[in-house]
């Protein structure tokens, strides 16, 4: 007799990662193409000699450095195995059967998965112009809303909400509902942007999520952090899987913060390429929403899968999202050139 599993998980779709095809250009997972800095590699080498020991489960050194980075005390900071694990923890501490978790759609595909695993109900509010519709989200709040995700910049569309709109939204939400502002791509933003940390200081029900996977180039090590009210941070720790951020990840994150200026200067190259790719795609006849992330979004609708399959045949791997569109990571200039050549021919 097979083991009895939770029946409600049967229809739950599995997370679909970006494809890896040897020898192909991978523009599917929003990774940086640049290697870790020498100082980060040196920190990893040193930490590697101690991997026979468990990592610091309290992240004392990393939290101390993060506290300086965000100019807030360490008790306002939680560390996780990437910000995605913190998303799951936020759901776990706020929502259960009969509760609702609210977010725009299409957005980060992990949101509905972790909500359903918790037994809660995901409420997806359609985007407007590929951007979070905060007015509609405010109207969707009910007596059983427990958590709201605002992905900003939004993944996979790359758009951001106006600072004044986000502030008004936060102020309109009842204070017992937690608001998670997911800023995985914040380092790539170049237009007027919300001071989310100010919102954390002003509103105990706001928490900000950030990651070292994108601009800091540590996607393979899995480390992210949350900034929020100490009560929220303490409760996150109660549902945290011990030792899930390795000693290597912690050492690399500390070293990366020490080299933050050099690392973040690299984002300027991505932003320059983002503008070039966006302009070229628009000239080729594509609709491309304004992106503030390290990728662009092509709302191709029913042709999304066709485009992605043809791209794969050309040895360029992009990320389709059902019948909504295709997300394309900004890669190295030569990789972007290859993608643009394919896109012009396909069009």
Swiss-Prot record:
List every position bearing N6-(pyridoxal phosphate)lysine: 214
Output this protein's name. Answer: Aromatic amino acid aminotransferase
Q: Which UniProt keywords apply?
A: Aminotransferase, Pyridoxal phosphate, Transferase
Q: What does this protein do?
A: Aminotransferase that catalyzes the conversion of aromatic amino acids and 2-oxoglutarate into corresponding aromatic oxo acids and L-glutamate.
Cofactor or coenzyme needed:
pyridoxal 5'-phosphate
Q: Which family does it belong to?
A: Belongs to the class-II pyridoxal-phosphate-dependent aminotransferase family.
Coiled-coil residue windows:
none
Task: Please give one Pfam family short name.
Answer: Aminotran_1_2
What does the record give as EC number? Answer: 2.6.1.57
Which InterPro entries is this protein grouped with?
Answer: Aminotrans_II_pyridoxalP_BS, Aminotransferase_I/II_large, ArAT, HisP_aminotrans, HistidinolP_aminotransfase, PyrdxlP-dep_Trfase, PyrdxlP-dep_Trfase_major, PyrdxlP-dep_Trfase_small
Q: Catalysed reaction(s)?
A: an aromatic L-alpha-amino acid + 2-oxoglutarate = an aromatic oxo-acid + L-glutamate
The Gene Ontology terms for molecular function here are:
aromatic-amino-acid transaminase activity; histidinol-phosphate transaminase activity; pyridoxal phosphate binding
Q: What PANTHER family would the database entry show?
A: HISTIDINOL-PHOSPHATE AMINOTRANSFERASE, HISTIDINOL-PHOSPHATE AMINOTRANSFERASE 2
Q: What does the subunit section of this Swiss-Prot or TrEMBL entry state? A: Homodimer.
Instruction: Give the UniProt record's GO annotations in the biological process aspect.
Output: L-histidine biosynthetic process
Origin species: Mycobacteroides abscessus (strain ATCC 19977 / DSM 44196 / CCUG 20993 / CIP 104536 / JCM 13569 / NCTC 13031 / TMC 1543 / L948) (Mycobacterium abscessus)
Q: Please indicate if the UniProt record lists Zinc-finger as a keyword.
A: no
């Amino acid at each position: 007799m097979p083991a009895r599993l939770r029946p409600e998980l049967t229809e739950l779709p599995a997370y679909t990662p970006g494809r890896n095809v040897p020898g192909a250009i991978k523009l599917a997972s929003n990774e940086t193409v640049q290697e870790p800095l020498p100082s980060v590699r040196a920190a990893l080498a040193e930490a590697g000699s101690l991997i026979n020991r468990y990592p610091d489960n309290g992240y004392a050194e990393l939290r101390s450095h993060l506290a300086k980075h965000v100019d807030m005390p360490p008790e306002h900071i939680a560390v996780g195995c990437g910000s995605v694990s913190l998303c799951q923890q936020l759901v776990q501490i706020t929502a259960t059967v009969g509760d609702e978790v609210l977010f725009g759609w299409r957005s980060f595909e992990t949101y509905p998965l972790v909500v359903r695993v918790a037994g809660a109900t995901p409420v997806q509010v359609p985007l407007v112009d590929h951007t979070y519709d905060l007015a509609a989200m405010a109207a969707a709040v009910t007596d059983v809303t427990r958590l709201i995700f605002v992905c900003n910049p939004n993944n996979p569309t790359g758009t951001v909400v106006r600072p004044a709109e986000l502030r008004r939204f936060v102020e309109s939400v009842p204070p017992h509902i937690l608001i998670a502002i997911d800023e995985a791509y914040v380092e790539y933003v170049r237009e007027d942007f919300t001071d989310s940390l100010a919102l954390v200081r002003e509103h105990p029900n706001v928490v900000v999520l950030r990651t070292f996977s994108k601009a800091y180039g540590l996607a393979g090590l899995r480390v992210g952090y949350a900034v929020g009210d100490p009560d929220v941070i303490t409760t996150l720790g109660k549902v945290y899987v011990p030792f899930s951020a390795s000693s290597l990840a912690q050492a690399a994150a500390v070293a990366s913060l020490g080299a933050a200026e050099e690392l973040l200067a690299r984002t300027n190259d991505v932003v320059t390429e983002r503008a070039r790719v966006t302009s070229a795609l628009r000239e080729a006849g594509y609709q491309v929403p304004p992106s503030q992330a390290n990728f662009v979004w092509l709302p191709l609708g029913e042709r999304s899968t066709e485009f992605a399959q043809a791209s794969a045949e050309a040895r360029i791997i992009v990320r389709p999202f059902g019948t909504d569109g295709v997300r394309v990571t900004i890669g190295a200039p030569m990789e972007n050139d290859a993608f643009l050549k394919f896109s012009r021919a396909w069009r």
